[in-house]
Swiss-Prot record:
Residues annotated as domain RRM: 197-268
Protein name as catalogued: Mitochondrial escape protein 2
Coiled-coil residue windows: none
Organism: Vanderwaltozyma polyspora (strain ATCC 22028 / DSM 70294 / BCRC 21397 / CBS 2163 / NBRC 10782 / NRRL Y-8283 / UCD 57-17)
Superkingdom in the source lineage: Eukaryota
Length: 830
């Protein structure tokens, strides 16, 4: 048997001679073992080949340590950090903080072996061979002539123990030195040290007593398993790694009683409890693992998300105008400027109120009073599209509040994918971090787990569940904001008074955040679940009395959804309608007057302001004429004012707004991309509403285009924003344009010869297509009836279908005739 490492005497030919030598047998003298070394462990041919090739024969390259008879080999332990595992952090710690260069290690070994306090005169350190995996170093010393090897080894052991114990970190850094008795094999295999060594016998095995006597000096032995007939090797288990490492490096290769001992670390059979549990009990293990991962995710991410939502509401750490400190600076500077303006006779509050008409100012005051009453504030602000609901709430009612959360349902509804929906919801709530892509991954994992275990893992969540989780986290953050200034005990007149959270919230309405939910409709074909979730969430906020909730909606139908979530709650309802002509006139004139008063007479503004002043009476008359078709819709009035401020005449501004509205209607409702029936229905209503301001539902219900599903068609156009419908006890009643400006736009589309010809032709073609489809359906029904044996049996049905076909055919003929007439008229105009 050959061994792949060896301690040899001398170098070159002397080493080869030692390798070829046959060691003498060990003998017992006076009860003591006499260990004579000389057994061949590695073939000498390898060194001969290396020498012939001129290759290195160092211990690092060959695993063999060379020394002469005048040298002694000592193993120093705990010089480097031991590799107890592949990811031992101690090795990185020592690598960064301890000097481990070759020179530093040699100085350290010399200091241990021959310190100034007890030097060995003439001792020379010849070489050091590090074994970093084991944390030690082999050192060869030249023995001085006046010492024997035994004396030098004993002094080195003593000095090392004393010197390494002087450090304040000696508990961790204490080193040991042991003479090397065997032939160490210097290898860097990935055999990590353990506290158990395996002793392989090349020859008759040693007894348990012999093994103990040989290995005990290196450390406390816990157990010895001697060799048996079936197992030819023994194992020695030490209390610590140190004993096993020193024994392996100092004894390996020794020969006793013609038996050579080869020592290796015994890798303990690891009991992979967790992996076995997963392999053998997948149905239990996978849900448990997922539950643990979920708990860890909650513990890590939920506090971050709650903080992020608080930041979204309070803006404490954001560099924006909503930041608390920036608001304080703005308030200070604004108050200073306001003081100067008031001194010069300019009333800022009066100027701000000019942005609202009288009824709106009263409604703002009512809203502010409701927020201060603190009696389960649940407000529903209802008004048609463009009535200024958002501006009324966000600017004039809660504009000075620092704890407002604004949610826009329309952005959530229009999210086409689950990932986009979750990102939009998280953005509005301030919910961060969020990982939408995980949902796709977990869905795949869920399918795999279901295939393996036969049951779903429950890892994947629907967007409804994830949205509900976001709202729950937001509720926790909102409650924390509301109770930020709460103290359970206050001092009143020298006495401690206990205060409940409910009492604190009741007494401090200003501490509660305001939640504004805009464009709440109650139902939708896509992502309609958000209305139910938001209503339930808002009801919890109000019932817990931790927030004020304001819903902005256009229709009455949303009240039904809110009533289901809060069945015992009386809503405070605020209805916004179009302004009267008088209020619209006052609003527009006040805006233009304030514009003139506030303008600085710069070179760019002189012309505009002078024109307005010079033609004030003329402009006033034009404004009166423009307000008739413009109506009292807030957004339209603001757009009109902006145009006039930019230098347009009122009539010019009105004409451009009508053209813009007409273009919008054409693109949304009358283009070729729109469904044919819907487009034809829209044109019929446009023609009717261009002549009358109000059309009764009874006038529509029996028209061919609406007869199949009249209510569905009307409601769809209402939801699209073309018309608005009033209801009488839940039944459709009166139909009006969605806003007053649309009345003028309808009239413009119908009476513009060029546009009306094109749009009317499109309408007639869609009517022809519609009627042709109906005729085809009836003909398909007639065909099998005509093949029946007795025509008299289905005469009634024949006559009915024939009459329907005749009526539709007349409509087609009339439509084609009208198209021909329109075409001829257009040719004549050219």
């Amino acid at each position: 048997m050959y061994r792949s490492g060896l301690l040899t005497s001398g170098g070159g030919s002397a080493a080869l001679t030692a390798l070829r030598a046959i060691g003498s047998r060990s003998s017992l003298s006076n009860g003591k073992f006499i260990w004579n070394v000389g057994k061949r462990f590695i073939t000498s041919e390898i060194q001969e080949k290396d020498q012939q090739a001129g290759e290195s024969n160092t211990a690092t390259d060959t695993g063999i340590i060379h020394k002469t008879e005048q040298e002694t080999l000592v193993y120093f332990d705990n010089v480097y950090p031991r590799d107890t595992s592949l990811w031992n952090p101690a090795q990185w710690y020592n690598l960064l903080l301890v000097n481990q260069s070759r020179e530093a290690v040699r100085d350290k070994i010399t200091e241990f072996a021959s310190p100034p306090s007890n030097p060995i005169h003439g001792l020379e350190l010849r070489s050091t061979i590090p074994v970093k995996r084991d944390g030690g170093v082999f050192a060869t010393f030249l023995v001085p002539s006046k010492y024997t090897k035994a004396e030098v080894n004993a002094i080195i052991q003593k000095n090392t123990a004393e010197e390494s114990s002087k450090s304040i970190f000696s508990f961790f850094t204490r080193a040991s030195a042991f003479p090397v008795k065997g032939f160490p094999w210097i290898e860097d295999l990935r055999r990590l040290p353990t506290n158990t060594i395996k002793v392989l016998f090349q020859g008759p095995p040693l007894t348990e007593e012999e093994i103990y006597s040989l290995f005990r000096r290196y450390g406390t032995i816990i157990d010895i398993v001697p060799a048996s007939d079936s197992v030819k090797n023994a194992s020695v288990r030490y209390k610590s790694l140190k004993g096993a490492i020193c024994a392996k490096n100092c004894v390996s290769g020794i020969e006793i009683h013609n038996t050579v001992l080869h020592i290796q670390y015994q890798q303990e059979a690891r009991n992979f409890v967790i992996s076995n549990f997963f392999v053998n009990h997948t149905r239990i293990a996978i849900p448990v693992m997922l539950a643990v991962l979920s708990i860890i995710a909650v513990l890590i991410f939920d506090p971050i998300r709650e903080f992020s939502i608080e930041q979204k509401i309070t803006h404490i750490y954001s560099l924006s105008w909503d930041n608390y400190w920036i608001r304080q600076i703005r308030n200070f500077t604004n108050s200073t400027v306001t003081s100067f303006r008031n001194y010069w006779g300019v009333n800022e509050n009066a100027f701000a109120e000019k942005h609202l008409w009288e009824e709106r100012i009263e409604k703002v005051n009512d809203l502010k009073m409701w927020l201060q009453e603190n009696n389960n504030t649940f407000v529903v602000v209802r008004g048609p599209r463009g009535s200024g609901k958002n501006e009324l709430i966000m600017q004039h009612t809660v504009g000075d509040r620092t704890n407002v959360l604004y949610l826009d349902c329309d952005k959530l509804i229009k999210s086409r994918t689950d990932a986009k929906f979750l990102r939009n919801a998280a953005s509005q709530l301030g919910y961060f971090p969020i990982f939408p892509w995980i949902n796709s991954v977990t869905s795949v994992i869920d399918l795999m787990v279901q295939g393996l275990t036969g049951q779903k893992s429950g890892l994947s969540e629907t967007k409804e569940a994830q949205f509900r989780t976001m709202l729950t986290t937001a509720l926790t953050s909102i409650r924390r904001i509301a109770l930020k200034g709460y103290k359970s005990v206050i001092v009143d007149g020298g006495e401690d008074v206990n205060v409940k959270e409910e009492d604190y919230l009741q007494q401090h309405p200003e501490a509660k955040p305001i939640i504004v939910i805009d464009r709440y409709e109650g139902k939708s074909e896509i992502n309609g679940f958000i209305y139910k979730e938001l209503a339930d969430w808002a009801s919890m906020l109000v019932q817990m009395n931790v927030a004020h909730v304001i819903f902005l909606t256009e229709t009455v139908s949303s009240n039904q959804q809110l009533s289901e979530s809060l069945p015992n709650q009386v809503f405070k309802t605020l209805v916004l309608s179009d302004a009267s002509k008088e209020n619209s006139r006052k609003y527009v004139l006040s805006q233009l007057q304030s514009f003139v008063d506030s303008k600085q007479k710069s070179k760019e503004d002189i012309k505009i302001t002078e024109n307005i002043e010079a033609e004030k009476s003329k402009i006033t008359d034009q404004i009166d004429d423009a307000l008739e078709p413009l109506g009292g819709r807030m957004l339209d009035l603001q757009a009109f004012v902006r145009r006039v401020k930019s230098g347009e005449q009122p009539t010019e501004a009105l004409d451009k707004m009508i053209e813009q509205a007409s273009e919008q209607i054409t693109q949304i409702f009358l283009s070729d991309k729109v469904d044919g029936i819907k487009s034809a229905q829209a044109w019929e209503l446009i023609e009717l509403l261009s002549a009358k301001s109000v059309v009764s539902y009874d006038d529509i219900v029996f028209k061919p285009l609406f007869k199949a599903a009249p209510e569905l068609g009307i409601v769809e156009l209402e939801n699209s924003g073309l018309i608005t419908v009033s209801r009488n006890r839940g039944v459709l009643d009166k139909i009006r344009p969605a806003k007053p400006l649309y009345k003028a736009a309808f009239y413009y589309l119908v009476n513009s010869q060029e546009l009306s010809t094109i749009l009317r032709t499109r309408y007639l073609l869609k009517v022809i297509t519609f009627e042709t489809g109906r005729i085809k359906k009836w003909e398909d029904e007639l065909r099998p009836l005509g093949k029946s044996g007795d025509p008299k049996l289905f005469r009634g049905r024949f006559e009915y279908l024939s009459g329907k076909i005749e009526t539709s055919n007349k409509v087609i003929v009339a439509s084609e005739a009208e198209i021909k007439a329109l075409s001829e008229r257009k040719q004549n105009q050219k």
